[in-house]
Structure formats: C-alpha cells, structure tokens
Amino acid sequence: MKIENRTELKEYRIECQKKQSADCRVLVCGGTGCLASGSGKIYEKLKELTKDHTGVEVKIGEEIAHTKVMKSGCHGFCEMGPLVRIEPYNYLYIKVKLEDCEEIYNETILGGRPVERLLYKMDGVTYPSQEEIPFYAKQTRLVLKNCGHIDAEHIGGALAVGAYAGIEKALFEMTPEAVIQTIYDSNLRGRGGAGFRTGRKWQQVASQKEKIRYVVCNGDEGDPGAFMDRSIMEGDPHRMIEGMMIAAYAVQAQEGYIYVRAEYPLAIERLKTAISQAEAIGLLGDNILGTNFSFHLHINRGAGAFVCGEGSALTASIEGKRGMPRVKPPRTVEQGLWARPTVLNNVETYANVPMIVTNGADWFKGIGTPESPGTKAFALTGNVRNTGLIEVPMGITLREVIYDIGGGIQNDKKFKAVQIGGPSGGCLTEDQLDSKMDFD
C-alpha cells in the first residue's frame, strides 16, 4: 500500500494505533547490550509461552487478541539488563533470565501481578514502575522517548506514536524557508560535540547557487564507551530518518546518506528495515504524500576509522576515497559530498528536528538553558552503580548525573574524576562536580 496524500496518512496512523493496542504489552529489550546478555532467547521464550495459551496469539507488528510481545530498542538501564517492560502496569523487570519467563507469564501476563524479585531495589526501597526508578526519574527523555517503548523493527509502532507528523506538517503547512527559520529560532545546536547552530548550517546550504544538494547523517560514533547514536538508530530509526527528510525539504535536497560504522550491525539492519518499510508505504521515494518533494535515502558502511567522524573525511569515505580531513575552506555546506552543498549533522541532532517542527521553537527553548536549549543524551559508563544510556536537560550538573541518576560510585567509594567528551574531551575532578552540562 502506498500512502498518496495527507488524509491517507492520518487514516493509516489510526489503523496502526488500533493494531498496537493490546490488553498486555511485553517489551523485551532488543538493544545490543541486552541481546548480548541473552534477551533474544527471553523474547523467543515469552513468545512461545504466549502462543501456547488458548486464545492468545503473538505476531510482531500485527494485531493481537490479548497480548503483544515485542522486541524493542534499548531501555537505557544497561547495568540491569536483560530488561523486560510489561504494560499497562509499567513494571520493569531487571536481570531477567530464561528461567524467569514462566513466572513472568503466569504472574504478570495472565495475573497482572508483579514478580517482586525482578523489580529494581535500591537502599531497601522497591520500585514497581519504571518511571519511579531514580535512574529514570530525573531524566527528560525526548529523543529517547520511544526507545524501549515501540517495536523497533516495524514502522506501524512508530507511526502509532507520531512518527512522520513533523514532515507531514512541514510539507503541508510550512515553506522550506519557514522550516529553516523554525530550526534557527529553536537554537538547536549540533549534538556531535561542536555545538554549531543547526539552523545556521541549513541556511548556508540553502543559500548556495548550486541546486544539487545532499543531506548526510554522521552515525560514525567513534568515542570509546559512547553508544547514544547507536541506541537511537537501533531503537527509533524512523525519528532520525524523519529529521533527515525535514532537512532535505528545507534545503531542497533529494538524496541523503547515513554513514554508519560497520561495528554497528544491528543499527544497520534496523535502518535498512526502516528505510525499506518507509519506501513500501510511500514515505520515502518520489512525490512523497502526493507532493513535489522526493527523497531517496542510502546507507554507507564505514570501516571504523576514528578520523571519519570528521565531516570532510566522512564525505570522502562515502565517495570511495581515503577518509582524510581536508583543509578548509571550503566547508561541507559549500562543497561537501561530491563537491556539492551538504547538510551534515549527527544522529541525535536529526532526531531532535521532528519534535521542534511539530511543537515549535518556543517549546524547545523552554527546555534546558537559553544558550543550550533541549536535552542531551549521554552514555554513563565506568565505576558508577547504574551505567546506561541517559537523556537529561541541558544545564543539569555533573553531580546530579553521577549521583542522582548514576547512583554514585560503586561500593560507596570516593569519587576521583570523570572523563567527558571522548578523546577530544578531558577529566574533571571532585571540585568541578557542580559544573553544568551545556555547550558554554
């Protein structure tokens, strides 16, 4: 089925919402970390148990009579994986083992009761729902909102929670210039590290005389211990794809490339699936939603060279050349991919775009700080009690991240230092724990 216009998209979205409804939704973490810990077998076992029960059918991405078992993206609480979330109760089961599946099935799926021993406990307190757990309570999950809550391998789950509403609004209610102005007014800054104003970059590309332009996504996440972009690509690929589509509409580009390192095989597979499904229903390709806007998206696998995270080296790699940074100017906005004007942003930056277009620049500026609005995803790793993927408002302090979200240092040891920003970052000591996390 090809969606030909805005009305058909709205009707299809409603259909997807109906298909996603179920008396009980079981979301087994299908992120790389949990899969490595055995969540794939847990998923298959829960599926098998549900099938064996009379009157309950399990099929990924299809309408189900009573119970839906889905393989989601990363839930974020990697220290406690494998994770299983049960809705509508919002129970989050931690460190689930294969032998726990029958008890989960009998007690929770059939009986609605929590399996107490699988719930998170801290300092003598048991937290039944995911939202109450301190690790999640202080986060503001916007970019990661759907990760762990939707079937990452089926477009229906993404559409049911609002995917492609931003590009729909842009195509039917906004001019390309208005889209760029909205992103500029929001003061969204690049989440790849440099913090350059995204709207300004788009303005520079749109102002070029050359009419052939490209949109490129930098998914070459090379910093040791970083897995923010990987988790977005694995858990909510349509959000990033939609952001690229909006950028393409804004600068009048018709072709885009996602550059992903080959060490992210699951992210690549889920991106392939997402692109294929979007093409199948007409959300990618020619004359999207019956408009004059066409956009084709490709995936390019990187070989893992750290230097290819730099813009000019990345575009050279896509072209089949050696990934080496070049002298600037010209910059990628002037001569990027194949010497054409190119919008180049990272995964998290694009993932912010649909929300800004849908909700407006003022909404986005109401989060974070005036100079660094919005949120930022971080990979919290090392000698803390709760490692994982977090998303916090800009302006939060290091102390809040490490102690309120991370739970402090393991075994109550003394804090020594925190390394931030990968190889290009640095180390901060105890007297800097109240430093705010922002670009300035």
Regions found by a protein language model. Give the residues of each.
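Terminal amphipathic helices with adjacent charged low-complexity linkers/tails
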Residues: 97, 105, 124-127, 255-279, ...
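Structural motif
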Residues: 24-26, 66-68, 83, 91, ...
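Hydrophobic alpha-helical positions that pack around
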Residues: 268-394, 406
